Regions:
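A generic structural micro-environment signature
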Residues: 7, 42, 49-52, 56, ...
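N-terminal propeptides/low-complexity segments immediately following signal peptides
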Residues: 22-27
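Sec/Tat signal peptide C-region and signal peptidase I cleavage site
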Residues: 16-20
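N-terminal secretory signal peptides that target proteins for export/translocation
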Residues: 1-2
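Mid-length scaffold segments of soluble, non-membrane domains
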Residues: 70-140
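Bacterial N-terminal signal peptides
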Residues: 5-14
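Amphipathic, charged alpha-helical segments and their helix-to-coil junctions
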Residues: 112-183
Length: 183
């Protein structure tokens, strides 16, 4: 019985993801969301090139070595993205669509609770900068993830207060962000 439940859950997650992505393809916002996808994929390719140019990282449980490798990757990405500014991926048009997609999700109790977790003082952050150490890596609720376009591996959405962050988890780098993503 448990095995059946696990199989059903495994089958349901990809199906719901596929349905969510089909929703975007058939929406009036398909062009704008397609532009977002192209911008994210362009970043992903840049990161892969930066990653390929580094010596291979040997598997390690040493937090210092892992952090050094992460910082090295972030530095190579930063060098390839010199002069990048906020809004390169979340253009005004894309941000407008995302705010509309997030508006109903922000009203959900689960989303509100997740955003209230561990509210330390506001940390500063910037594009091409590290995700702030003082900020919790906020768990994204399933309803929010389903409302937004899927992302490539190791690129994730996060919230810092009302700001939606596009984070490179491998480099611990803020790729871009949009302010006041939720009301």
């Amino acid at each position: 019985m448990i095995r059946l439940a696990i199989v059903m859950l495994a089958l349901a997650v990809p199906a719901s993801t596929v349905r969510a992505q089909e929703k975007f393809q058939n929406s009036p916002d398909a062009r704008v969301l397609g532009d977002f996808k192209v911008r994210v994929e362009k970043y992903d390719q840049l990161r892969k090139k930066a990653d390929d140019s580094a010596p291979p990282l040997k598997e390690s449980k040493d937090a210092g070595k892992i952090k050094d490798a992460q910082q090295g990757l972030a530095e190579r990405i930063g060098a390839a993205r010199v002069g990048v500014k906020q809004g390169e991926i979340f253009t005004p048009e894309i941000a407008q669509v995302f705010r509309r997609l997030l508006r109903p999700e922000a009203k959900e109790k689960e989303t509100r609770q997740a955003l209230q977790e561990d509210k330390p003082e506001v940390a500063s952050f910037k594009v091409n900068g590290p995700y702030p150490d003082k900020e919790p890596v906020t768990t994204m609720t399933p309803n929010v993830l389903q409302a937004l376009p899927a992302l490539p591996k190791d690129i994730e959405y996060r919230f810092i207060r009302k700001n939606l962050i596009l984070r490179d988890a491998r480099a611990n780098l803020i790729i871009d962000y949009m302010t006041n993503a939720i009301p």
